[in-house]
């Protein structure tokens, strides 16, 4: 039985590696679709399921998707640097929620769930936003910031697990994996 991470995210791979898992990385070819409204948790789970649906045989495939939720609006990955800066302006001085959906495919079945973490960012100055966006770091991250990177200095409060914000809630993953692959 082989564990496969259906993601090109180096952050998800790093979390799995640090938790002691042996796995292959095979980014999913699943198309992401815009948030249709409704429950952000259901949306992240549906995207994670689409990513995990690929694979077969004796593989256990893990898919995940993360969004930032502010005042009921879902912030995915920014389209460009201007979009990333706009997201950071909206999040500045505010508390928001990060939702990560995880799905595991094994033996033709898909199990999924989600985890939520609340974060508060301090008020950000315009020059800080510009300098951070200029690093390029926020361009591939939901909400336009990387908690595990340069944006860590913006966070004043974290309620929940950091790995949910980084993109792979390990406690949830452990529950979803077949027993023979679970790590303590």
Where do the protein language model's features map onto the residues?
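Cofactor-binding loop segments of dinucleotide-utilizing enzymes, especially the Rossmann-like FAD-
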Residues: 8, 28, 107
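Short glycine-rich, Thr/Ser-proximal phosphate-binding strand/loop in the N-terminal lobe
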Residues: 20-37, 110-115
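Anionic-ligand binding patches
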Residues: 1-4, 37-184
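Short loop/helix-cap segments at secondary-structure boundaries that form the rim of catalytic
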Residues: 14-18, 35, 55-57
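N-terminal beta1-alpha1 ligand-phosphate binding loop
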Residues: 1-21
């Amino acid at each position: 039985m082989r564990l496969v991470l259906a993601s090109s995210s180096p952050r998800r791979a790093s979390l799995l590696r640090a938790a002691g898992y042996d796995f292959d990385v095979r980014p999913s070819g699943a198309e992401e679709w815009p948030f249709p409204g409704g429950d952000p948790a259901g949306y992240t789970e549906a995207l994670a399921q689409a990513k995990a649906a690929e694979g077969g045989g004796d593989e256990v495939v893990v898919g995940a998707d993360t969004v930032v939720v502010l005042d009921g609006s879902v912030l995915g990955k920014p389209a460009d640097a201007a979009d990333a800066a706009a997201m950071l302006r909206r999040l500045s001085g505010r508390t928001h929620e990060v939702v990560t959906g995880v799905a595991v495919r094994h033996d033709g079945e898909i199990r999924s769930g989600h985890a939520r973490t609340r974060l508060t960012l301090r008020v950000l100055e315009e020059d800080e936003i510009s300098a951070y966006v200029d690093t390029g770091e926020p361009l591939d991250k939901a909400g336009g910031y990387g908690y595990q990177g340069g944006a860590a200095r913006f966070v004043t409060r974290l309620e929940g697990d950091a790995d949910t914000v980084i993109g792979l809630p390990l406690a949830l993953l452990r529950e979803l994996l077949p027993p023979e692959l679970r790590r303590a």
